[in-house]
């Protein structure tokens, strides 16, 4: 039974703009510069700010009054950490998050993030219960794989990503709609430079962090930029030409943004 198409999020479109789309190597260098002695940031600081950005984007597009149940799907790396942080903020924003986190990151940071969620009473669903959690969700936050993902998708992530890809094969009770998907930085299993070459799922909303990735050029849904922490000298070093964030916002919509004219000849 195919799902009916979910309503489009009620976000206002931003004016067309140009900014730099970056590859995985540049994204890695930006993170390294931020966490260097001269950059001064720690990983948990960047993760906190990134997760807050993601939670705010979800709130702007899918408010808790209409979309209270969020399934936060987390991977074992830093991308998953962003999702854990986002789940905490979503709880405080009035949502009822459920976390799918089948493979925990190895450092103490991930353990502490998980403890924070347990202390709020957030439920964690088992590895095999992804589909059941999906049936109850109003929104899915995809924070499984980030810009460092390479190779084939393996379990325990392969089956859930296949479910999202072939959602029309699932039959929900009471004719529930397939929930919209919000992806963090790059949709899980997309190639960071080439885009959806693996024919994976396509989210409704994408939240690029620091700067949009080259693989997002073909993304046609709602597109946000988050991670309001880059100093001006770092933006200039990589010629990112990022837009200004309004007021106290942690995200800015960049739907329809084009690459810099100096990039177009190479794309």
Swiss-Prot record:
Textual note on the cofactor: Binds 1 potassium ion per subunit.
Cofactor annotation: K(+)
GO cellular component: mitochondrion
Disulfide bond residue pairs: none
Localization: Cytoplasm; Mitochondrion
GO molecular function, one term: metal ion binding
Reaction it catalyzes: (6R)-NADHX = (6S)-NADHX; (6R)-NADPHX = (6S)-NADPHX
Enzyme class: isomerase
Annotated residues for binding of K(+): 79, 142, 188
Entry keywords, A to Z: Cytoplasm, Isomerase, Metal-binding, Mitochondrion, NAD, NADP, Nucleotide-binding, Potassium
Residue ranges of every copy of the YjeF N-terminal domain listed in the record: 27-242
A Pfam family: YjeF_N
Residues annotated to bind (6S)-NADPHX: 78-82, 146-152, 185
EC number: 5.1.99.6
InterPro entries per record: YjeF_N_dom, YjeF_N_dom_sf, YJEFN_prot_NAXE-like
Similarity field: Belongs to the NnrE/AIBP family.
Purpose of the protein: Catalyzes the epimerization of the S- and R-forms of NAD(P)HX, a damaged form of NAD(P)H that is a result of enzymatic or heat-dependent hydration. This is a prerequisite for the S-specific NAD(P)H-hydrate dehydratase to allow the repair of both epimers of NAD(P)HX.
Record-given protein name: NAD(P)H-hydrate epimerase
Species for this entry: Mycosarcoma maydis
């Amino acid at each position: 039974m195919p799902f009916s198409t979910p309503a489009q999020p009620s976000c206002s479109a931003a004016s067309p703009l140009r900014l730099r789309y970056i590859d995985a190597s540049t994204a890695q260098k930006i993170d390294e510069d931020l966490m260097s002695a001269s950059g001064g940031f720690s990983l948990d600081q960047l993760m906190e700010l990134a997760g807050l950005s993601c939670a705010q984007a979800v709130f702007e597009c899918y408010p808790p009054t209409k979309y209270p149940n969020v399934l936060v799907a987390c991977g074992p790396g830093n991308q998953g950490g962003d999702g854990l942080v986002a789940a905490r903020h979503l709880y405080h924003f009035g949502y009822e998050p459920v976390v799918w986190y089948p493979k925990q990151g190895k450092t103490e940071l991930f353990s502490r993030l998980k403890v924070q969620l347990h202390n709020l009473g957030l439920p964690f669903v088992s590895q095999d219960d992804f589909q059941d959690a999906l049936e109850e969700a109003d929104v899915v936050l995809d924070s499984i794989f980030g810009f460092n993902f390479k190779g084939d998708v393996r379990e325990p992530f392969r089956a859930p990503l296949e479910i999202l890809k072939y959602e029309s094969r699932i039959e929900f009770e009471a004719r529930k709609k397939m929930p919209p998907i919000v992806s963090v930085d790059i949709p899980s299993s997309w190639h960071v430079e080439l885009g959806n070459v693996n024919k994976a799922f396509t989210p409704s909303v994408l939240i690029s962090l620091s700067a949009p990735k080259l693989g997002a050029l073909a993304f046609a849904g709602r597109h946000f930029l988050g991670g309001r922490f880059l100093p001006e000298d770092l933006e200039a070093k990589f010629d990112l030409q990022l837009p200004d964030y309004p007021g106290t916002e942690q995200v800015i919509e960049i739907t329809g943004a084009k690459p810099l004219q100096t990039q177009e000849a190479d794309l």
